[in-house]
Protein backbone atom coordinates (compact mmCIF):
# COMPACT_ATOMS: atom_id res chain seq x y z
CA UNK A 1 0.00 0.00 0.00
CA UNK A 2 1.31 3.47 -0.94
CA UNK A 3 0.35 6.49 1.16
CA UNK A 4 -0.21 10.20 0.87
CA UNK A 5 -0.88 12.66 3.71
CA UNK A 6 -2.52 16.08 3.69
CA UNK A 7 -0.72 18.78 5.66
CA UNK A 8 -2.46 21.96 6.84
CA UNK A 9 -0.20 24.76 8.02
CA UNK A 10 -1.44 27.78 9.92
CA UNK A 11 0.52 30.80 11.05
CA UNK A 12 -1.01 33.78 12.81
CA UNK A 13 1.06 36.74 13.97
CA UNK A 14 -0.52 39.78 15.52
CA UNK A 15 1.57 42.91 15.87
CA UNK A 16 0.22 45.93 17.69
CA UNK A 17 1.72 48.66 15.51
CA UNK A 18 -1.00 51.20 14.96
CA UNK A 19 -1.88 53.37 11.99
CA UNK A 20 -4.23 56.28 11.29
CA UNK A 21 -4.47 55.69 7.57
CA UNK A 22 -7.67 53.67 7.74
CA UNK A 23 -10.98 55.46 7.59
CA UNK A 24 -13.79 55.16 10.11
CA UNK A 25 -15.86 53.29 7.55
CA UNK A 26 -13.33 50.44 7.44
CA UNK A 27 -13.31 50.20 11.22
CA UNK A 28 -17.07 50.12 11.27
CA UNK A 29 -17.13 47.43 8.59
CA UNK A 30 -14.80 45.21 10.60
CA UNK A 31 -17.01 45.64 13.63
CA UNK A 32 -20.23 44.93 11.78
CA UNK A 33 -19.05 41.93 9.75
CA UNK A 34 -21.95 39.69 8.92
CA UNK A 35 -21.78 35.94 8.67
CA UNK A 36 -22.47 35.27 5.04
CA UNK A 37 -20.41 37.24 2.52
CA UNK A 38 -19.09 35.87 -0.76
CA UNK A 39 -16.97 32.79 -0.23
CA UNK A 40 -17.27 29.04 0.31
CA UNK A 41 -20.69 28.06 1.69
CA UNK A 42 -19.33 25.64 4.30
CA UNK A 43 -21.32 25.98 7.49
CA UNK A 44 -19.86 28.26 10.14
CA UNK A 45 -21.06 25.59 12.57
CA UNK A 46 -18.33 23.33 11.11
CA UNK A 47 -15.76 25.57 12.80
CA UNK A 48 -17.34 25.13 16.21
CA UNK A 49 -18.10 21.42 15.80
CA UNK A 50 -14.45 20.89 14.91
CA UNK A 51 -13.46 23.05 17.89
CA UNK A 52 -15.44 20.86 20.29
CA UNK A 53 -13.93 17.72 18.77
CA UNK A 54 -10.40 19.09 19.22
CA UNK A 55 -11.13 20.14 22.81
CA UNK A 56 -12.32 16.62 23.61
CA UNK A 57 -9.04 15.27 22.17
CA UNK A 58 -6.91 17.68 24.24
CA UNK A 59 -8.68 18.45 27.54
CA UNK A 60 -7.06 21.22 29.53
CA UNK A 61 -4.75 22.21 26.66
CA UNK A 62 -4.49 25.22 24.39
CA UNK A 63 -6.44 24.85 21.16
CA UNK A 64 -5.73 26.75 17.97
CA UNK A 65 -6.65 25.93 14.38
CA UNK A 66 -7.95 27.36 11.12
CA UNK A 67 -11.35 25.99 10.09
CA UNK A 68 -10.82 27.73 6.75
CA UNK A 69 -7.63 25.77 6.07
CA UNK A 70 -9.18 22.47 7.14
CA UNK A 71 -12.35 22.97 5.09
CA UNK A 72 -10.28 24.02 2.07
CA UNK A 73 -8.19 20.84 2.35
CA UNK A 74 -11.37 18.77 2.53
CA UNK A 75 -12.77 20.67 -0.44
CA UNK A 76 -9.71 19.80 -2.51
CA UNK A 77 -9.95 16.17 -1.45
CA UNK A 78 -13.61 16.03 -2.48
CA UNK A 79 -12.59 16.91 -6.05
CA UNK A 80 -11.19 13.41 -6.43
CA UNK A 81 -13.58 11.48 -4.20
CA UNK A 82 -16.24 9.02 -5.32
CA UNK A 83 -19.90 9.48 -4.43
CA UNK A 84 -19.98 7.95 -0.93
CA UNK A 85 -16.69 9.48 0.19
CA UNK A 86 -17.62 12.85 -1.33
CA UNK A 87 -21.02 12.80 0.41
CA UNK A 88 -19.36 12.15 3.78
CA UNK A 89 -16.97 15.06 3.26
CA UNK A 90 -19.73 17.48 2.28
CA UNK A 91 -22.00 16.30 5.11
CA UNK A 92 -19.12 16.83 7.54
CA UNK A 93 -18.77 20.39 6.28
CA UNK A 94 -22.49 20.95 6.79
CA UNK A 95 -23.26 20.92 3.06
CA UNK A 96 -25.46 18.80 0.82
CA UNK A 97 -24.49 17.15 -2.45
CA UNK A 98 -28.16 17.07 -3.46
CA UNK A 99 -28.54 20.84 -3.13
CA UNK A 100 -25.72 21.55 -5.57
CA UNK A 101 -23.50 23.04 -2.89
CA UNK A 102 -20.36 21.25 -4.09
CA UNK A 103 -19.88 23.63 -7.01
CA UNK A 104 -20.55 26.59 -4.72
CA UNK A 105 -17.91 25.29 -2.32
CA UNK A 106 -15.19 25.12 -4.99
CA UNK A 107 -16.19 28.40 -6.67
CA UNK A 108 -16.35 30.06 -3.26
CA UNK A 109 -12.78 29.08 -2.44
CA UNK A 110 -11.71 30.24 -5.90
CA UNK A 111 -13.22 33.69 -5.24
CA UNK A 112 -11.69 33.81 -1.77
CA UNK A 113 -8.21 32.94 -3.03
CA UNK A 114 -8.46 35.64 -5.69
CA UNK A 115 -9.51 38.23 -3.11
CA UNK A 116 -6.81 37.26 -0.61
CA UNK A 117 -4.16 37.76 -3.29
CA UNK A 118 -5.02 41.44 -3.51
CA UNK A 119 -2.72 43.61 -1.33
CA UNK A 120 -4.21 45.08 1.83
CA UNK A 121 -2.63 47.93 3.78
CA UNK A 122 -1.45 46.77 7.20
CA UNK A 123 -2.58 43.16 6.72
CA UNK A 124 -0.72 40.19 5.27
CA UNK A 125 -3.05 37.31 4.51
CA UNK A 126 -2.07 34.50 2.18
CA UNK A 127 -3.88 31.24 1.60
CA UNK A 128 -2.79 28.54 -0.79
CA UNK A 129 -1.87 24.94 -1.44
CA UNK A 130 0.64 22.73 -3.21
CA UNK A 131 0.73 19.14 -4.37
CA UNK A 132 3.98 17.19 -4.27
CA UNK A 133 3.76 13.99 -6.31
CA UNK A 134 6.11 11.20 -7.24
CA UNK A 135 6.66 11.10 -11.04
CA UNK A 136 6.13 7.32 -10.97
CA UNK A 137 2.51 7.80 -9.89
CA UNK A 138 -0.03 8.97 -12.45
CA UNK A 139 -2.42 11.64 -11.16
CA UNK A 140 -5.51 12.26 -13.26
CA UNK A 141 -5.22 15.32 -15.48
CA UNK A 142 -8.74 16.54 -14.65
CA UNK A 143 -7.91 16.47 -10.92
CA UNK A 144 -4.69 18.44 -11.44
CA UNK A 145 -6.55 20.91 -13.67
CA UNK A 146 -9.29 21.44 -11.08
CA UNK A 147 -6.71 21.91 -8.32
CA UNK A 148 -4.96 24.55 -10.42
CA UNK A 149 -8.10 26.35 -11.63
CA UNK A 150 -10.24 26.29 -8.50
CA UNK A 151 -7.62 26.21 -5.74
CA UNK A 152 -4.67 27.83 -7.54
CA UNK A 153 -2.56 24.93 -6.34
CA UNK A 154 1.08 24.53 -7.33
CA UNK A 155 2.21 21.05 -8.40
CA UNK A 156 5.77 19.80 -7.90
CA UNK A 157 7.46 16.62 -9.06
CA UNK A 158 9.05 15.03 -5.98
CA UNK A 159 11.31 12.00 -5.75
CA UNK A 160 9.83 10.20 -2.75
CA UNK A 161 12.22 7.33 -3.50
CA UNK A 162 14.82 9.56 -1.84
CA UNK A 163 13.01 10.63 1.36
CA UNK A 164 15.71 13.10 2.47
CA UNK A 165 15.58 15.06 -0.78
CA UNK A 166 11.77 14.99 -0.78
CA UNK A 167 11.65 16.16 2.83
CA UNK A 168 14.01 19.05 2.11
CA UNK A 169 12.00 20.16 -0.93
CA UNK A 170 8.72 20.21 0.99
CA UNK A 171 10.17 21.82 4.13
CA UNK A 172 11.79 24.57 2.04
CA UNK A 173 8.42 25.31 0.44
CA UNK A 174 6.70 25.41 3.83
CA UNK A 175 9.35 27.72 5.30
CA UNK A 176 9.01 30.11 2.35
CA UNK A 177 5.20 30.27 2.51
CA UNK A 178 5.20 30.85 6.29
CA UNK A 179 7.94 33.48 6.11
CA UNK A 180 10.38 31.24 7.96
CA UNK A 181 8.12 30.70 10.96
CA UNK A 182 7.58 26.98 10.37
CA UNK A 183 10.78 25.08 9.58
CA UNK A 184 11.51 21.35 9.49
CA UNK A 185 7.79 20.64 9.52
CA UNK A 186 8.21 17.18 8.02
CA UNK A 187 10.52 15.14 10.19
CA UNK A 188 9.72 11.61 9.05
CA UNK A 189 9.19 10.53 5.46
CA UNK A 190 9.69 7.18 3.78
CA UNK A 191 9.47 5.65 0.34
CA UNK A 192 5.88 4.46 0.87
CA UNK A 193 4.71 8.06 0.45
CA UNK A 194 3.84 8.98 -3.12
CA UNK A 195 2.01 12.31 -2.78
CA UNK A 196 1.67 15.10 -0.21
CA UNK A 197 -0.87 17.91 -0.32
CA UNK A 198 0.05 21.04 1.65
CA UNK A 199 -2.44 23.77 2.53
CA UNK A 200 -1.25 26.90 4.30
CA UNK A 201 -2.63 30.14 5.65
CA UNK A 202 -0.38 32.98 6.81
CA UNK A 203 -1.80 35.95 8.69
CA UNK A 204 0.15 38.92 10.00
CA UNK A 205 -1.71 41.98 11.18
CA UNK A 206 -1.38 45.19 13.13
CA UNK A 207 -3.87 46.39 15.69
CA UNK A 208 -5.62 49.58 14.65
CA UNK A 209 -4.49 50.97 18.00
CA UNK A 210 -1.44 49.60 19.75
CA UNK A 211 -0.88 48.36 23.25
CA UNK A 212 2.07 50.06 24.92
CA UNK A 213 4.93 47.92 26.17
CA UNK A 214 5.26 50.19 29.21
CA UNK A 215 1.81 49.04 30.32
CA UNK A 216 2.68 45.33 30.12
CA UNK A 217 3.27 43.79 33.54
CA UNK A 218 3.36 40.35 35.08
CA UNK A 219 0.02 39.22 36.47
CA UNK A 220 -1.47 36.01 37.79
CA UNK A 221 -3.32 33.87 35.25
CA UNK A 222 -5.64 31.28 36.80
CA UNK A 223 -5.09 28.13 34.74
CA UNK A 224 -7.47 26.35 37.13
CA UNK A 225 -9.19 27.57 40.31
CA UNK A 226 -6.27 26.10 42.27
CA UNK A 227 -3.36 26.79 39.93
CA UNK A 228 -1.96 30.14 38.84
CA UNK A 229 0.98 31.19 36.70
CA UNK A 230 2.60 34.55 36.02
CA UNK A 231 2.14 35.90 32.49
CA UNK A 232 2.94 39.23 30.79
CA UNK A 233 -0.38 41.08 30.72
CA UNK A 234 -0.95 43.86 28.19
CA UNK A 235 -3.19 46.75 29.23
CA UNK A 236 -4.95 49.52 27.33
CA UNK A 237 -7.87 51.69 28.37
CA UNK A 238 -9.86 52.63 25.29
CA UNK A 239 -13.14 52.23 23.45
CA UNK A 240 -13.84 48.65 22.33
CA UNK A 241 -16.64 46.65 20.78
CA UNK A 242 -18.28 44.98 23.77
CA UNK A 243 -21.15 42.61 24.51
CA UNK A 244 -22.27 40.79 27.65
CA UNK A 245 -23.97 37.57 26.57
CA UNK A 246 -26.18 36.56 29.47
CA UNK A 247 -27.62 33.58 27.58
CA UNK A 248 -24.38 31.59 27.67
CA UNK A 249 -22.62 33.61 30.41
CA UNK A 250 -19.65 35.29 28.76
CA UNK A 251 -18.15 38.67 27.91
CA UNK A 252 -17.09 39.32 24.31
CA UNK A 253 -14.57 42.01 23.34
CA UNK A 254 -13.83 42.87 19.71
CA UNK A 255 -10.43 44.35 18.83
CA UNK A 256 -10.04 45.50 15.22
CA UNK A 257 -6.98 45.01 13.05
CA UNK A 258 -6.03 47.02 10.04
CA UNK A 259 -7.37 45.58 6.80
CA UNK A 260 -10.95 44.71 7.79
CA UNK A 261 -10.11 41.96 10.28
CA UNK A 262 -11.31 41.66 13.85
CA UNK A 263 -10.38 39.46 16.80
CA UNK A 264 -13.10 38.41 19.21
CA UNK A 265 -11.92 37.52 22.71
CA UNK A 266 -14.50 35.58 24.69
CA UNK A 267 -14.24 35.44 28.50
CA UNK A 268 -16.62 32.91 30.09
CA UNK A 269 -17.99 33.73 33.52
CA UNK A 270 -16.26 31.78 36.26
CA UNK A 271 -17.11 28.09 36.02
CA UNK A 272 -19.02 28.55 32.74
CA UNK A 273 -16.43 27.47 30.14
CA UNK A 274 -18.31 24.29 29.19
CA UNK A 275 -21.58 26.20 28.90
CA UNK A 276 -19.98 28.72 26.53
CA UNK A 277 -18.30 26.01 24.44
CA UNK A 278 -21.57 24.13 24.07
CA UNK A 279 -23.32 27.35 23.00
CA UNK A 280 -20.90 28.23 20.21
CA UNK A 281 -22.63 28.16 16.84
CA UNK A 282 -23.31 30.36 13.83
CA UNK A 283 -26.33 32.02 15.42
CA UNK A 284 -24.37 32.93 18.56
CA UNK A 285 -21.56 34.45 16.50
CA UNK A 286 -24.01 36.43 14.38
CA UNK A 287 -25.71 37.73 17.52
CA UNK A 288 -22.41 38.94 19.00
CA UNK A 289 -21.53 40.89 15.88
CA UNK A 290 -25.01 42.39 15.73
CA UNK A 291 -25.20 43.34 19.42
CA UNK A 292 -21.73 44.90 19.78
CA UNK A 293 -21.75 48.37 21.34
CA UNK A 294 -18.86 50.77 21.93
CA UNK A 295 -17.82 50.77 25.56
CA UNK A 296 -14.81 52.24 27.30
CA UNK A 297 -12.89 49.34 28.79
CA UNK A 298 -9.81 49.03 30.95
CA UNK A 299 -8.69 45.88 29.16
CA UNK A 300 -6.09 43.39 30.36
CA UNK A 301 -5.09 40.78 27.77
CA UNK A 302 -2.21 38.28 27.98
CA UNK A 303 0.71 38.55 25.61
CA UNK A 304 1.02 34.97 24.47
CA UNK A 305 2.28 32.48 21.93
CA UNK A 306 0.66 29.09 21.35
CA UNK A 307 1.35 26.22 18.99
CA UNK A 308 -0.69 23.14 18.19
CA UNK A 309 -0.45 20.10 15.93
CA UNK A 310 -3.39 17.81 15.25
CA UNK A 311 -3.77 14.50 13.47
CA UNK A 312 -7.17 15.11 11.94
CA UNK A 313 -7.60 11.49 10.89
CA UNK A 314 -8.37 10.92 14.60
CA UNK A 315 -10.79 13.85 14.83
CA UNK A 316 -12.76 14.16 11.58
CA UNK A 317 -14.51 10.77 11.99
CA UNK A 318 -16.33 12.38 14.95
CA UNK A 319 -17.85 14.76 12.40
CA UNK A 320 -18.95 11.91 10.15
CA UNK A 321 -15.96 11.99 7.78
CA UNK A 322 -14.94 8.36 8.27
CA UNK A 323 -14.21 6.42 5.08
CA UNK A 324 -11.62 8.79 3.63
CA UNK A 325 -8.87 7.53 5.96
CA UNK A 326 -9.65 3.86 5.42
CA UNK A 327 -9.26 1.34 2.62
CA UNK A 328 -12.98 1.90 1.91
CA UNK A 329 -12.26 5.40 0.57
CA UNK A 330 -13.02 5.98 -3.09
CA UNK A 331 -10.32 8.34 -4.41
CA UNK A 332 -10.58 7.19 -8.01
CA UNK A 333 -10.94 10.80 -9.14
CA UNK A 334 -7.35 11.46 -8.04
CA UNK A 335 -5.55 8.44 -9.46
CA UNK A 336 -6.25 5.14 -11.18
CA UNK A 337 -3.95 3.36 -8.72
CA UNK A 338 -6.10 1.30 -6.36
CA UNK A 339 -3.39 0.78 -3.75
CA UNK A 340 -3.00 4.44 -2.79
CA UNK A 341 -4.50 5.52 0.54
CA UNK A 342 -4.83 8.81 2.43
CA UNK A 343 -2.68 8.02 5.44
CA UNK A 344 -2.97 11.16 7.56
CA UNK A 345 -4.15 14.74 7.66
CA UNK A 346 -1.91 16.90 9.83
CA UNK A 347 -2.90 20.41 10.89
CA UNK A 348 -0.17 22.57 12.44
CA UNK A 349 -0.89 26.05 13.74
CA UNK A 350 1.01 28.81 15.50
CA UNK A 351 -0.18 32.06 17.03
CA UNK A 352 1.64 35.05 18.50
CA UNK A 353 -0.15 38.02 20.06
CA UNK A 354 1.88 40.97 21.26
CA UNK A 355 1.83 44.71 21.75
CA UNK A 356 3.72 47.38 19.77
CA UNK A 357 6.84 49.26 20.69
CA UNK A 358 6.56 52.38 22.84
CA UNK A 359 7.23 54.74 19.94
CA UNK A 360 4.38 53.39 17.85
CA UNK A 361 1.97 53.60 20.75
CA UNK A 362 3.00 57.16 21.53
CA UNK A 363 2.49 58.22 17.90
CA UNK A 364 -0.95 56.70 17.72
CA UNK A 365 -2.69 57.71 20.90
CA UNK A 366 -6.32 56.73 21.41
CA UNK A 367 -8.78 56.38 18.55
CA UNK A 368 -11.76 57.52 20.64
CA UNK A 369 -12.13 60.98 22.11
CA UNK A 370 -14.84 62.39 24.35
CA UNK A 371 -16.10 65.97 24.44
CA UNK A 372 -17.41 65.84 27.99
CA UNK A 373 -15.83 64.49 31.15
CA UNK A 374 -14.09 61.18 30.63
CA UNK A 375 -16.60 58.40 31.32
CA UNK A 376 -15.88 55.63 33.76
CA UNK A 377 -14.40 52.50 32.21
CA UNK A 378 -15.31 48.87 32.81
CA UNK A 379 -12.37 46.75 33.90
CA UNK A 380 -12.09 43.41 32.08
CA UNK A 381 -9.22 41.06 32.87
CA UNK A 382 -8.52 37.98 30.76
CA UNK A 383 -6.85 36.27 33.71
CA UNK A 384 -8.47 32.86 33.30
CA UNK A 385 -8.95 30.54 30.29
CA UNK A 386 -10.68 32.23 27.38
CA UNK A 387 -11.68 31.64 23.77
CA UNK A 388 -10.92 33.59 20.63
CA UNK A 389 -11.94 33.75 17.02
CA UNK A 390 -10.44 35.84 14.27
CA UNK A 391 -12.50 36.95 11.30
CA UNK A 392 -11.73 38.68 8.03
CA UNK A 393 -14.94 40.12 6.61
CA UNK A 394 -17.37 37.25 7.33
CA UNK A 395 -14.86 34.41 7.19
CA UNK A 396 -13.73 32.59 10.32
CA UNK A 397 -9.98 32.32 9.83
CA UNK A 398 -9.02 30.99 13.26
CA UNK A 399 -10.61 29.61 16.41
CA UNK A 400 -8.75 29.03 19.66
CA UNK A 401 -8.81 28.41 23.37
CA UNK A 402 -6.08 29.80 25.62
CA UNK A 403 -5.74 27.72 28.77
CA UNK A 404 -2.02 28.21 29.37
CA UNK A 405 -0.67 31.46 27.82
Curated annotation (Swiss-Prot):
Propeptide: 20-24
Post-translational modification: N-glycosylated; glycans consist of a mixture of sialylated bi- (including sialyl-Lewis X epitopes), tri- and tetra-antennary complex-type chains; affects the maximal heparin- and thrombomodulin-enhanced rates of thrombin inhibition. O-glycosylated; further modified with 2 sialic acid residues. Proteolytically cleaved at the N-terminus; inhibits slightly the heparin- and thrombomodulin-enhanced rates of thrombin inhibition. Proteolytically cleaved. Inhibition of proteases is accompanied by formation of a stable enzyme-inhibitor complex and by degradation of the serpin to lower molecular weight derivatives.
GO process annotations (BP): spermatogenesis
GO annotations of cellular component type: acrosomal membrane; external side of plasma membrane; extracellular exosome; extracellular space; platelet alpha granule; platelet dense tubular network; protein C inhibitor-coagulation factor V complex; protein C inhibitor-coagulation factor Xa complex
Keywords, alphabetical: Glycoprotein, Protease inhibitor, Secreted, Serine protease inhibitor, Signal
Predominant cellular place of this UniProt entry's protein: secreted
Matches recorded under InterPro entries: Serpin_dom, Serpin_fam, Serpin_sf, Serpin_sf_1, Serpin_sf_2
SUPFAM superfamilies the record matches: Serpins
Carbohydrate attachment residues: 247
Signal peptide: 1-19
SMART domains: SERPIN (SM00093)
Documented activity regulation: Its inhibitory activity is greatly enhanced in the presence of glycosaminoglycans, heparin, thrombomodulin and phospholipids vesicles.
Subcellular location: Secreted, Extracellular space
Described purpose of this protein according to its UniProt entry: Heparin-dependent serine protease inhibitor acting in body fluids and secretions. Inactivates serine proteases by binding irreversibly to their serine activation site. Involved in the regulation of intravascular and extravascular proteolytic activities. Plays hemostatic roles in the blood plasma. Acts as a procoagulant and pro-inflammatory factor by inhibiting the anticoagulant activated protein C factor as well as the generation of activated protein C factor by the thrombin/thrombomodulin complex.
Protein name as catalogued: Plasma serine protease inhibitor
Recorded name of the encoding gene: Serpina5
